């Protein structure tokens, strides 16, 4: 299914009076002076959260204690352009293993970089990561600073999904012998599952789950359907939400609802709808530069139930969407008055929304609806 922006305008205009007004939400700044924070992961038992800073630091934050010093044991990262330390997630068996997973950009011998993923053990005192092991590397390394992707999601069935950008090398998203522009599926131990779609295809990378992706920035499990949802940046226009299926081609750069930043057509593009490629479940004709995303699955605030929240880097707000099966509609925006690039959005275990702003003096925000 696709929706063009002129279908959305009446909905946005009607609903933005409700959702975009500053008075619709309460905002508490929990932490400031974060240097380009990228992701957060909640720790169990009210022990706060881990926060990645793109420059390469992993920090711990806890209410009443504030922000820790940088944790030791984190891998070296290539912090250039859009690269650096990216996502952080807890292993499904964290309570027993203390294992955390990190994604980050890693440079190769020729000075070009790619996304890498690994895991280590978080110490009981939350001060260090030990025994870090890299289990996945995007190959070949092609990036000079753009389109790393890097979001990590465990699906609750024993698998880890890794969203990878095409390193600003458009045609590679269609090449099954390369890991650019792909969604990768591994086991929760970092191994390649036997039922991955291209495992028996000669010349194809066995890690690949789906392909034809430009620059994925948000990924989350839909708690109502148990399906994985993914968003990605288009070029000039064409930001998308997809529900990636096994072995499917999501089009980039052959099919896109966007154009080049120059205003001209994408050279490889054959149109918006192209045979053999999947259509997004939602797209924006004018790109908000989507980022971290979170489904609201809590009883804390009934007015937020069945909502999907997506950060917007360019539009500097949080997009509020209603979810009905595999269909979504945009209800409007929140945090528009703050004028901050939104990098990550997560639903906390307490039912509040937690937001990271992407700035040299970024903030951790706690957000709730105003009754």
UniProtKB/Swiss-Prot annotation:
Q: Which residues bind Ca(2+)?
A: 240, 250
Q: Which cofactor does it need?
A: Ca(2+); pyrroloquinoline quinone
Where in the chain are disulfide-linked cysteines found? none
Molecular function terms from GO: calcium ion binding; oxidoreductase activity, acting on the CH-OH group of donors, quinone or similar compound as acceptor; pyrroloquinoline quinone binding
Residues given in the record as pyrroloquinoline quinone binding sites: 82, 261
InterPro entries with a match to the protein in the record:
6-blade_b-propeller_TolB-like, Glc/Sorbosone_DH, Quinoprot_gluc/sorb_DH_b-prop
| Record-annotated active site | 147 (proton acceptor)
| Cofactor binding, per record | Binds 2 calcium ions per monomer.
Where located?
A: Cell outer membrane
Q: What is its EC number?
A: 1.1.5.-
Q: Does the keyword Calcium apply?
A: yes
Role according to the record: Aldose sugar dehydrogenase with broad substrate specificity. The physiological substrate is unknown. Can oxidize glucose to gluconolactone. Can also utilize D-arabinose, L-arabinose and 2-deoxy-glucose. Has higher activity towards oligomeric sugars, such as maltose, maltotriose or cellobiose. It may function to input sugar-derived electrons into the respiratory network.
- In Swiss-Prot or TrEMBL terms, this protein is called Aldose sugar dehydrogenase YliI
Task: Give the organism the record lists.
Answer: Escherichia coli (strain K12)
Gene that produces this protein: yliI
């Amino acid at each position: 299914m696709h929706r063009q922006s002129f279908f959305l305008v009446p909905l946005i205009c009607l609903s933005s009076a409700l959702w975009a007004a500053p008075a619709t939400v309460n905002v508490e700044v929990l932490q400031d002076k974060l240097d380009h924070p990228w992701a957060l992961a909640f720790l169990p038992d009210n022990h706060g959260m881990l926060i990645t800073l793109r420059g390469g630091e992993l920090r711990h934050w806890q209410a009443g204690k504030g922000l820790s010093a940088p944790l030791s044991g984190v891998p070296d990262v290539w912090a250039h352009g859009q690269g650096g330390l990216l996502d952080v997630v807890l292993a499904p068996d964290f309570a027993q293993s203390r294992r955390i997973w990190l994604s980050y950009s890693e440079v190769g011998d020729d000075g070009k970089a790619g996304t890498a993923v690994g895991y280590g053990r978080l110490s009981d005192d939350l001060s260090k990561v030990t025994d870090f092991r890299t289990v996945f590397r995007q190959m070949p390394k092609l990036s000079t600073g753009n389109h790393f992707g890097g979001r990590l999601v465990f699906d609750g069935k024993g698998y880890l999904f890794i969203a990878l950008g095409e390193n600003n090398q458009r045609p590679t998203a269609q090449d099954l012998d390369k890991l650019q522009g792909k969604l990768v599926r591994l086991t929760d131990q970092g191994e390649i599952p036997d039922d991955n779609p291209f495992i028996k295809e000669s010349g194809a990378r066995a890690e690949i789950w789906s392909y034809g992706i430009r620059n994925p920035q948000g990924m989350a499990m839909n708690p109502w359907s148990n399906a994985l949802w993914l968003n990605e940046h288009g070029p000039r226009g064409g930001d998308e939400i997809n529900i990636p299926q096994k072995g499917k081609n999501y089009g980039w750069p052959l099919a896109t609802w966007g154009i080049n930043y120059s205003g001209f057509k994408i050279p490889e593009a054959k149109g918006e709808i192209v045979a053999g490629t999947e259509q997004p479940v939602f797209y924006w004709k004018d790109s908000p530069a989507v980022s971290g995303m979170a489904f609201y699955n809590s009883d804390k605030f009934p007015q937020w139930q069945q909502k999907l929240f997506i950060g917007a880097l360019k539009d500097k707000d949080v997009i509020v969407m209603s979810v009905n099966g595999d269909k979504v509609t945009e209800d409007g925006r929140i945090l528009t008055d703050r004028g901050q690039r939104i990098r990550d959005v997560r639903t906390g275990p307490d039912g509040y929304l937690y937001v990271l702003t992407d700035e040299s003096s970024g903030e951790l925000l706690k957000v709730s609806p105003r009754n």
